[in-house]
């Protein structure tokens, strides 16, 4: 009997009395994006074929033919010679058709005991597992670049902000290490997500399992999975692992976006804390002086793109009854684009961070504005017995006086300070000015998690050790 796969183009066409509409073919075909799964599809098929042979479901000659044919197909794909056909719907049927053309009936036996439902679920998990590992490495590269820059700036003082208002002095190294913490958690989330990705769906078949005496654990071991999906319906129908990865990716991009916002602000001429290397910037077609931080700006925009993919996948799954539905074909493009966006962003950011020029004088000048050591003066009074709320009120009064005069707290003489703060004058001595310096302020935060240079250097050492694990 002539194979329906080669007679009409569809693997299922014998059931139907008329050919599929060309419009429907174009609408339902996924081959021109899911061909990205081709190499993992081949890997999954080879593991499946070896299991079928071991279980005496196919013979050794069939297995040898399948392995020979798949080797040729893999080479054609890698060389860009494989001819993808819209009529064959997807990556799976394109490869199967080519295999059958090369080796004959043995190619038709490969699909014994499986469905495209468990096949594609396996492909996605195999592919995503590798991409998670790649993204983990890129996160480590970015963490390493930030750690290096933090170490170089353990003593560089800048203003810390709340509400974008000057709050307290911090070291630039401490500020950068905050992002190291964020990206470290991102890496942990990726590793955690991988444990749920790394389960084998193959063997679930269409939805109920198969009547053949398959060995799912052998296939899982061959493909490097930690175990098998325990329920066949769940194995083929849920994409929560893809949603979880995309959610973790959205957090990666959220942290990138926050960092990007600061880079843009820091590079602006009115702030001037840093300069980004020319190779990461662009100019203007009309304004000759412009140097635009397009990379961080675009990263902010791409964060919305990944957030959109997360919402798309959540919406995709929310209304589906068990088991597999064609809706799930729509999981791949958001997933593929999320991987590409995150990977490209992390790669370029690691390189860009390594090329940042820091301007310590501008940072220091900004930290001297906005009464950034006011809290230190309050703490000084508290350490001399004044309740904190009373100290807070007294210093707020002093700030108002200095603001009206256009000077900083440190610009007051000792006599002026006592005169303006008569209620606490007896607590103020010559040593107060040491508390009002930027260096004294940051040095006093000398505890784990604090901004002092010594703590920054200790945190750098710990971060490097964590990165090496």
UniProtKB/Swiss-Prot annotation:
One of its GO terms (molecular function) is argininosuccinate lyase activity. It comes from the Bacteria. The keyword Cell membrane does not apply. One of its GO terms (cellular component) is cytosol. Keywords: Amino-acid biosynthesis, Arginine biosynthesis, Cytoplasm, Lyase. It catalyses: 2-(N(omega)-L-arginino)succinate = fumarate + L-arginine. Signal peptide: none annotated. Pfam families: ASL_C2, Lyase_1. One of its GO terms (biological process) is arginine biosynthetic process via ornithine. Pathway: Amino-acid biosynthesis; L-arginine biosynthesis; L-arginine from L-ornithine and carbamoyl phosphate: step 3/3. Its EC number is 4.3.2.1. InterPro entries: Arg_succ_lyase_C, Argininosuccinate_lyase, Fumarase/histidase_N, Fumarate_lyase_CS, Fumarate_lyase_fam, Fumarate_lyase_N, L-Aspartase-like. It is found in: Cytoplasm. Disulfide bonds: none annotated. PANTHER family: ARGININOSUCCINATE LYASE. Belongs to the lyase 1 family. Argininosuccinate lyase subfamily. This is Argininosuccinate lyase. It comes from Burkholderia cenocepacia (strain HI2424).
